[in-house]
Amino acid sequence: MAPVGVEKKLLLGPNGPAVAAAGDLTSEEEEGQSLWSSILSEVSTRARSKLPSGKSILVFGEDGSGKTTLMTKLQGAEHGKKGRGLEYLYLSVHDEDRDDHTRCNVWILDGDLYHKGLLKFAVSAESLPETLVIFVADMSRPWTVMESLQKWASVLREHIDKMKIPPEKMRELERKFVKDFQDYMEPEEGCQGSPQRRGPLTSGSDEENVALPLGDNVLTHNLGIPVLVVCTKCDAVSVLEKEHDYRDEHLDFIQSHLRRFCLQYGAALIYTSVKEEKNLDLLYKYIVHKTYGFHFTTPALVVEKDAVFIPAGWDNEKKIAILHENFTTVKPEDAYEDFIVKPPVRKLVHDKELAAEDEQVFLMKQQSLLAKQPATPTRASESPARGPSGSPRTQGRGGPASVPSSSPGTSVKKPDPNIKNNAASEGVLASFFNSLLSKKTGSPGSPGAGGVQSTAKKSGQKTVLSNVQEELDRMTRKPDSMVTNSSTENEA
């Protein structure tokens, strides 16, 4: 064991192990402080990179333009309920890189201007910098597009002016928006990870930092917030071509005016179709890019007439002039409503439904009509009352038409064969008696008694005829009495 003095000498030596121990303690403290600093820095960085929760989207459009259906589709719901006044829903936003979620508020204003006062509940002076505006235009009715956009843009401008934002703050918002518009960079082809916006420059000449000046008609109506013009129901382009004889010239003219409007407000333009699910995913990605700064790599699309996409900052007057090269019957400066005319309203022709009239009412009308008509003699009424000049027609000689129809309860009397036999026997007796008379009167007599015989012949002829008539009457009454007795027996 070493002496105590020696141990003290070792510990207290000027260049001994004591100096090394103190150095180790200092290095450990520095490492601990650096560790805590890195942890705090990481926490603060994560806090700053967390998705904000106060972002909002404000949607304007006419009734029936499909704005609620569009936002409901972006939300992921199949069917949305149509509200009144000011509708609210939200979009779920997920950042895969940071594994973070948030909700983006969506406010949809009613198409009736009566409800524009409700904007104060959706946008305030504090929330305006965190707001994205969407103007919805109905492409199935292109004659209403420009008027609708101008109307809703003026409504938004009026509301912003009423909020009484300090001029310094408003100018700052406008300068920031101009810078974002000028800093647009089209993504490189085949580069999926390149951001749409130009990042901070680490090297390069001063010329790269100089922004290009704005054109004459660019950002003349700067609202200080991003604006997006969405044309819905673009699947109706084929219907316009068939039913309203729209040609490529009409579609280019519409697109030209839309792009000019977007240049004035620094807005993006996108054609969509919920029915065909066209450009819906593209619209969602562009919204979260403008709102949360997500990477966006889709360039401008102008080839398809019903799937146009023009991001904010890409367009200019020279690119729009390319559309004017195909104009033959219209000029670029012509008024929109002069060429895109509202078609006349076609009245639908329906088969008129005939209601059955009440029977009594119908009969009363016929009776009143007959009463108003003058009485005119008819052929049927003249026939029975013909004068002496007419043909002597008796009622008993009527044809089959004059025979009255017998009712089911009336029995038809059958002819009796005995009557025919009696008539035949009467004829035989009459001829027999006549032959006898002729023989008696025609017998030869004395010639001198010719005058007496003729006189006697006349008187005797009358007597015989009267006797014959009496005999015939008697014989006629006898068969009738026999028929009557036989019928009485049958009834009994």
From Swiss-Prot:
Gene3D superfamilies: P-loop containing nucleotide triphosphate hydrolases. Its main location: cytoplasm. Pfam families: DLIC (PF05783). Residues 400-412 have a biased composition (Low complexity). The keyword Metal-binding does not apply. The keyword Nucleotide-binding applies. Residues 371-381, 452-469, 482-492 have a biased composition (Polar residues). It comes from the Eukaryota. It is found in: Cytoplasm, Cytoskeleton. The modification Phosphoserine is found at S194, S383, S391, S443, S446. ATP binds at G61, E62, D63, G64, S65, G66, K67, T68. The modification Omega-N-methylarginine is found at R397. Residues 471-480 have a biased composition (Basic and acidic residues). GO terms for cellular component: centrosome; cytoplasm; cytoplasmic dynein complex; microtubule. Keywords: ATP-binding, Cytoplasm, Cytoskeleton, Dynein, Methylation, Microtubule, Motor protein, Nucleotide-binding, Phosphoprotein, Transport. The modification Phosphothreonine is found at T441. One of its GO terms (biological process) is microtubule cytoskeleton organization. InterPro entries: Dynein1_light_intermed_chain, Dynein_light_int_chain, P-loop_NTPase. GO terms for molecular function: ATP binding; dynein heavy chain binding. Residues 187-206, 371-423, 437-492 are annotated as: Disordered. PANTHER family: CYTOPLASMIC DYNEIN 1 LIGHT INTERMEDIATE CHAIN 2, DYNEIN LIGHT INTERMEDIATE CHAIN. Homodimer. The cytoplasmic dynein 1 complex consists of two catalytic heavy chains (HCs) and a number of non-catalytic subunits presented by intermediate chains (ICs), light intermediate chains (LICs) and light chains (LCs); the composition seems to vary in respect to the IC, LIC and LC composition. The heavy chain homodimer serves as a scaffold for the probable homodimeric assembly of the respective non-catalytic subunits. The ICs and LICs bind directly to the HC dimer and the LCs assemble on the IC dimer. Interacts with DYNC1H1; DYNC1LI1 and DYNC1LI2 bind mutually exclusive to DYNC1H. Acts as one of several non-catalytic accessory components of the cytoplasmic dynein 1 complex that are thought to be involved in linking dynein to cargos and to adapter proteins that regulate dynein function. Cytoplasmic dynein 1 acts as a motor for the intracellular retrograde motility of vesicles and organelles along microtubules. May play a role in binding dynein to membranous organelles or chromosomes. Belongs to the dynein light intermediate chain family. This is Cytoplasmic dynein 1 light intermediate chain 2. It comes from Macaca fascicularis (Crab-eating macaque). The lineage of its organism: Eukaryota, Metazoa, Chordata, Craniata, Vertebrata. The gene is DYNC1LI2.
